[in-house]
Each structure stands twice: as C-alpha cells, then as structure tokens.
Amino acid sequence: MSSKSDTPVASEDFNKVYNSSFAHWMWSDVRIPKELKDLVTINKPKTSLELGCGLGRFSSFMAEQGIKATGVDFSSVAIEKAKKRVVNAEHKPTFIVGDVTNLKMINEQFDISFDVGCFHCLNEQEQQKYVSEVYRLLKPGATHLIWAIDSSPSDIKLSPNYIAKVFANSFRLAKTEPSRRRIISSHWYWLVRAQ
C-alpha cells in the first residue's frame, strides 16, 4: 500500500501493530465522530459497510443504532479483537477479514458506507479498485463518507480536488469539511453514488 518504509503497509504489518501496546495508544479514541452520527441521522440507513474497520468501534456504534452493520479489515488480528469486543453485545456487527480493493465475498448493497482512516493508505491503483468496490457495494444514491489525512502515508497529497477526480466516474463529491482529528490536518468527504 504505502511507499514510506516506516509505515505499516501489509496485513502482516498491521497485525504486528494490533498485537502491540502501540495499537492501544493509536486507536484508543473511542469517541464517535459527529460526522458519523450525522451520516446516520440524515440517511436513516438499515445497512452500513465500514472499510478498514480496525477494532470495529464505529461498526459497533452502527449496530447499537439498530443498523445491520458490516466491518471489513485486512488485519486478521484486528478482526479477531473486534469480534471479542462485541461477544456480549446485544447488537453485533458482522466483521470480515478482507482487502478493501477486492471484496468479492460481499454480495449485498448497502445504504451507507464509510472509511475513517483507510483510503489515505492506498496507492493510486488500489484507490481505483477501492472506488470500484464501493460503487458495487453501495445502493444508487447512497452516501460514502471518508475521513482522510491530507498528507497521506501513501505519499499522495489528498485534497477535495484530488478526491473528486478519483471518484469522478462513479460518485459526486457532495461536501468536504476540513478536520484536525488527532491533531492531523485532514478532511471529511461526503460522496454520493451515481444512480
């Protein structure tokens, strides 16, 4: 995925991170972003798909709202930990080990999808595959929400213009909002799937 040598890029790399104490520090922020709450309030989805779900806290939030939630991550360690986190939960999301650029094991279409920190790790070729998969897995007119770092680990400078261009054939960039999540310059992107 990424070209920076010190950045985790493969599922094995992320498995090591998720098995370390660093994972707790890096992904321990359990607050649900306002943007995700708004996604639910505005769209009133029955189904949701999270790409790069990690430990599954956002998919768990969706399930708690009564949404049939599915979370995907290529780290088997993250998915194992996500499943353990919800073992006693009343409403459980489905967690799947999978590559966000090739999700052939999923055949349903979702009312919404979202990605909080995955897209910015992909190279240009992977981004194109990602867009194709999100298009295939979302219902026409559905919203895909992305949070991405502006100076991404993949060395690609992300911006509203760049995101609009990458998604142009399948989605309309409906809204962007600058963010300082985790003290990092970033943006939220609301993309609407073509009919």
What are these regions (language model features)?
Residues 1-51, 55-105, 122-133, 137, ...:
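Class I (Rossmann-like) S-adenosyl-L-methionine-dependent methyltransferase catalytic domain
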Residues 105-113:
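A short acidic, Gly/Pro-enriched loop at the edge of an enzyme's catalytic core
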